[in-house]
Amino acid sequence: MDLLFDFFSLDFVYYPVSWIMWVWYKLFAAMLGPSNFFAWALSVMFLVFTLRALLYKPFVRQIRTTRQMQELQPQIKALQKKYGKDRQRMALEMQKLQREHGFNPILGCLPMLAQIPVFLGLYHVLRSFNRTTGGFGQPHLSVVQNRLTGNYVFTPTDVGHFLDANLFGAPIGAFMTQRTGLDAFTYFSRPAVIAVGLPVMILAGVATYFNSRASVARQSPEAAANPQTAMMNKLALYVFPLGVVVGGPFLPLAIILYWFANNIWTFGQQHYVFGMIEKEDEAKKQEAIQRRAANAPAPGAKPKRNLKAGAGNGVDADAAQPDAGATEGQAGGGSDAPSRTPRPGARPKKRKR
């Protein structure tokens, strides 16, 4: 393995990316063969899955932050209307609002920002399998020298297996419009590269569109009405998917597979996380309803008397004592004058004329 670490480069990105890809490659190569096209393709795809699994919690925070941002839209609009001309006061009020609700907009960007260096690192590692073309940051090697040179954690033998891997003559490290460095591959057929890359490229664009569509569909009406949000929605729905299709011919097949796998994972994870959050919100609503129902009085029940208030003023207790004495007098029959207080439930006596 070529482990010459350069602290003044992006090796801190290149080595982890190549190591994760190398682990998955060795696993699939043991089952499919070291020069198998699908062993290398699956290693790239599972590199994506590993990264996205590590970013699962930040992704959930991103979704919660996005939903919280939508809930705060009415208050943000009110601040914009009130302090629209005073940018400094507007910024202070926005920070105050974010602190009150525990809102951190940086968390919403973390998963996206974390994927950028990984994408650049993977692109560089894949380019480094074929160093016969030279270019920015790449040595210009001969075909023989290239096969005898390792690629970060990949050995020279692994480099040879990568250059040999192809599907119907389409090397996994080649791209449709490639004109140089073709001698490094054992087999190269441009029609085969187009035939393999075009369907994956279209699927990656379609997956990008459906991901964007799912995100836009879950936006609140207030957020969708925002002009900036509306513009970003149009870019996400139409420009980004089209960019994948247009840029596909200039990217290696492995990068197109990376983009396709990333969008497939995002689509599934997005639906799972949104469903989980909706269930949590529904459970909170049901808990609140049950709490209110438990505290509410039963239908037809009389309100409870405040015994403390009665004991404090002594009125009810004093008023109840004569009645109790009169009742006892009636029961004993020893009172001088019969009580005129009717017994509870007794019918009133008719007065004789």
Curated annotation (Swiss-Prot):
Required for the insertion and/or proper folding and/or complex formation of integral membrane proteins into the membrane. Involved in integration of membrane proteins that insert both dependently and independently of the Sec translocase complex, as well as at least some lipoproteins. Aids folding of multispanning membrane proteins. InterPro entries: YidC/ALB3/OXA1/COX18, YidC/Oxa/ALB_C, YidC_ALB_C. Keywords: Cell membrane, Chaperone, Membrane, Protein transport, Transmembrane, Transmembrane helix, Transport. GO terms for molecular function: membrane insertase activity. It comes from Mycolicibacterium paratuberculosis (strain ATCC BAA-968 / K-10). The chain crosses the membrane at residues 3-23, 28-48, 106-126, 191-211, 237-257. It is a multi-pass membrane protein. Belongs to the OXA1/ALB3/YidC family. Type 1 subfamily. This is Membrane protein insertase YidC. GO terms for cellular component: plasma membrane. It is found in: Cell membrane. Residues 291-301 have a biased composition (Low complexity). It comes from the Bacteria. Pfam families: 60KD_IMP. Interacts with the Sec translocase complex via SecD. Specifically interacts with transmembrane segments of nascent integral membrane proteins during membrane integration. Residues 285-353 are annotated as: Disordered. GO terms for biological process: protein insertion into membrane; protein transport. The lineage of its organism: Bacteria, Bacillati, Actinomycetota, Actinomycetes, Mycobacteriales. Its main location: membrane.
